[in-house]
Curated annotation (Swiss-Prot):
Heme binds at C455. It comes from the Eukaryota. It comes from Chaetomium globosum (strain ATCC 6205 / CBS 148.51 / DSM 1962 / NBRC 6347 / NRRL 1970). It is found in: Membrane. Disruption phenotype: Impairs the production of chaetoglobosin A but leads to the accumulation of cytoglobosin D and chaetoglobosin J. Cytochrome P450 monooxygenase; part of the gene cluster that mediates the biosynthesis of chaetoglobosin A which has a unique inhibitory activity against actin polymerization in mammalian cells. Chaetoglobosin A and its intermediates are involved in the morphological differentiation of C.globosum. The first step of the pathway is the synthesis of prochaetoglobosin I via condensation of one acetyl-CoA, 8 malonyl-CoA, and a L-tryptophan molecule by the PKS-NRPS hybrid synthetase cheA, followed by reduction of backbone double bond to install desired geometry by the enoyl reductase cheB. Induction: Expression is positively regulated by the cluster-specific transcription factor cheR that binds directly to an asymmetric direct repeat present in the promoter. This is Cytochrome P450 monooxygenase cheE. CDD domains: CYP503A1-like. One of its GO terms (molecular function) is iron ion binding.
Length: 512
């Protein structure tokens, strides 16, 4: 890691860089590898029928093309190719649902999300923190194992954060909730991963909120400004990549004193309150992780969770505001469950949260109706692969499944274009009560992925979103300004997020 930073900060002679660049260009011309899509001629390529296949068109109208491809190919069990405007060097293949079972159990050595991330977001050039086995273990095992103990701390952070960012008046006041939600989710995950010391650092919270946009912007600019054979130069020369390095370095400086306190046996957390830094220190045994390693783990989890959780929370809130009668019914459920659990000091437990069946069903239906991502289970083929039915995919092919189309397929969900707030509650009552909840994954609900590679943090996200909504619905009257309803989502490539700039009216209930 030290060598990494020395290299990042070195000041090479322009002449040396020029010579190396020319050498790379010559080598690229002489030994040009076979393009990945050369081995995909057996899979149809879908384009816009009107002939406008510009990059801007693909980014703007992705859902329309996915829908056309779903009706023509994937619903009939056939894959198709789409142009990959974000990563032209790697073709993307949209797969039908029949391949879900094989992909769900495929090892990382065959189909890799990490490789997909490196290709799609240029992680090797932007210096963005990467997923590691430690990160996955920390979230999938330690966080889920300690969920009960983490909820009290999470609720405390949510209450403090929302109270500081939302209006606190007896009169109706306008606000744009998104940044309050991003700040809140960042504080909550910081408390879980680093205790009070980390969640109390405003610099860290701001860094954790901003690093996602920083890394994505760096990757986009590098892709636009550097051809593939010259991208190695961007690691040292591109301002965005250098800004990511500076952020990572500063994050290590913030984390290091916390680590030293833990090693000295002192910490500013309640007895019995576990957190990610403790888990990392315990997991390393005799090998002590560096502050940079710990900070990178923390930043990666923030990149993976802060904005997705915030956008999902905002989307559910918008859907509730469009259905005030349903919202009142859910508030009634919240109050009834809270009354049954008054003996826990006003704090929500796992058991109490699990009894909020109407809220959970509404969240699941909102997640189906307005998914924040149009696709799921993105992977890159690590090796040439042949599926059981004979479908061949060459190495480095990117694959994905069209979540948005599964969600709106009448053969999967009856009356798919109707928002039914109790859809999933009725499914639980009619079948297995342990299925069909918000964090549940199946071949019909793949928003969180599937199988052994399903999102490991989905259970925490479910509890966190519930705690956020409980606080907002019970502490505030909330409504749209007169005459307004949920604005259209912002669709960009495979992203389908709620409008972050919409104004909502808040009034503090406790003071009104």
């Amino acid at each position: 890691m030290t060598g990494f930073y020395f290299a990042a900060e070195s000041s090479w002679s322009p002449y040396v860089i020029l010579v190396l660049a020319l050498a790379a260009m010559v080598a690229n011309r002489l030994v040009r590898p076979k393009r990945p899509n050369d081995g995909l001629n057996h899979i149809p390529m879908l384009e816009f029928e009107d002939g406008d296949n510009s990059t801007e068109r693909y980014i703007r109208d992705t859902w329309a093309l996915l829908h056309a491809g779903y009706l023509k190919y994937t619903k009939r069990g056939m894959p198709f190719q789409m142009r990959n405007p974000a990563d032209p060097d790697h073709p993307q293949v949209v797969l039908p649902a029949k391949y879900l079972s094989e992909l769900k159990s495929a090892p990382e050595s065959r189909f890799s999300f990490r490789l997909y991330s490196e290709q799609a977001f240029l992680l090797n050039y932007s210096h963005a923190p990467k997923q590691t086995d430690r990160t996955t273990h920390m979230v999938r095992t330690e966080m889920n194992k300690n969920m009960g103990a983490l909820l009290e701390a999470t609720q405390e952070e949510i209450e403090v954060a929302l109270a500081s960012k939302l209006p606190n008046s007896t009169a109706w006041e306008p606000a744009t909730p998104y940044m309050a939600l991003a700040y809140t989710t960042s504080r909550a995950i910081a408390r879980v991963l680093g205790g009070r010391e980390l969640s109390g650092s405003e610099e860290w919270i701001g860094m954790n909120v901003g690093v996602t946009g920083m890394t994505h912007q760096a990757a986009q600019q590098i892709r636009e400004q550097y051809p593939p054979h010259l991208r190695w130069m961007a690691r040292w020369r591109h301002p965005g990549a250098r800004a990511v390095i500076a952020t990572r370095r500063r994050s290590a400086q913030i984390v290091d004193p916390i680590i030293q306190k833990r090693l000295a046996g002192a910490q500013d957390t309640k007895p019995g309150e576990p957190d990610g830094i403790q888990w990392m220190l315990a997991a390393q045994g005799s090998r002590r992780p560096s502050a940079q390693e710990v900070a990178d783990e923390q930043l990666f989890v923030g990149i993976a969770s802060v904005h997705t959780t915030s956008a999902t929370s905002l989307s559910i809130l918008y859907d509730l505001l469009d259905r005030p009668n349903v919202a009142e019914e859910i508030i009634g459920e919240i109050n009834a469950v809270a009354a049954r659990h008054r003996d826990v000091g006003g704090r929500w437990t796992k058991q109490a949260l699990s009894e909020l069946e109407k809220l959970d069903s509404f969240m699941a239906e909102s997640f189906r109706f307005n998914p924040v991502g149009l696709v799921t289970m993105q992977r890159s083929a690590v090796v040439d692969y042949v599926f059981q039915d004979g479908l061949r995919l060459p190495k480095h092919t990117q694959i994905l499944f069209p979540t948005c189309e599964f969600n709106r397929d009448g053969d999967v969900h009856p009356n798919p274009d109707v928002f039914d707030p109790w859809r999933f509650l009725k499914m639980r009552k009619a079948g297995d009560p342990n299925k069909h909840h918000f964090a549940y994954v199946s071949d019909q609900m793949v928003g969180f992925g599937g199988g052994t590679h399903a999102c490991p943090g989905r259970y925490f996200a479910s509890y966190e979103i519930k705690l956020i909504l409980i606080h907002m619905l019970t502490r505030y009257d909330i409504k749209w300004p007169d005459g307004l309803t949920r604005p259209p989502n912002m669709v960009h490539d495979f992203s389908n997020v709620p409008n972050f700039t919409a104004t909502v009216l808040f009034r503090n209930k406790s003071k009104s």
